[in-house]
Amino acid sequence: MGYFYFCDANNCPLAQGTAIKFPSLVQHEAIIDRAWNGQQVLLEKSKQHKKPRVTNSEEYRNVPFVISRVPSSPAHGLRIVQHAYAEIQAGAPWTAFDNCQDFVSRAYTGRNGSETRNFVFGALAVVGLVGMAAASSR
C-alpha cells in the first residue's frame, strides 16, 4: 500500500515546511515534512495529545484542509521544520496560550500567533464592552 500525501490543486505533494489548516471551529494547524523513508508526516502541537509531536499523515486522511502558509524557498522550508522539531524536542505542553497555531507561527516567524485565540479574546472584549454599556445606561 502506498503512502498518503497532502497535495495541492495540481495533485503535487506539498513541500516541506508548508502549513495546513483543518477547517473547524478551532482551525487546527500543522506543518508538512518528510520522514527518512519519504513518507509525508505532520508536525503539530495537539490539544488531544497534550504536546507537540510528529504524526503520520494517514491520521488526517479524508479530512478537508487548506494551505495556510507556504515557505518562500526550500531553504526556508527546512528552517521552518528545524524550528518545529526543536519545539517538539522541548515538549512544552499544549495550552490555550500556546496552541497549534502558536506552534506554526513560531516555526515561521519566531513569534506567537493564534487567530482562534485572538478571535475569542476579541469576542470577549466586545461582550464585555456591550455589558458595561448596558449596565451604565440603566
Q: What kind of region is each of these model predictions?
A:
Residues 3-68:
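Glycine-rich catalytic cores of cysteine/serine-nucleophile enzymes that process amide/ester linkages
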Residues 5-7, 59, 63, 72-75, ...:
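Amphipathic, alpha-helical segments enriched in basic
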Residues 48-50, 119-124:
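Charge-dense, low-complexity polyampholytic segments
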Residues 67-121:
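Active-site nucleophile-His-acid catalytic modules used for acyl/amide transfer and hydrolysis
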Residues 103, 125-128:
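Short amphipathic alpha-helical face segments that pack within enzyme cores
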Residues 114-120, 129-138:
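Short hydrophobic alpha-helical membrane-entry/anchor segments
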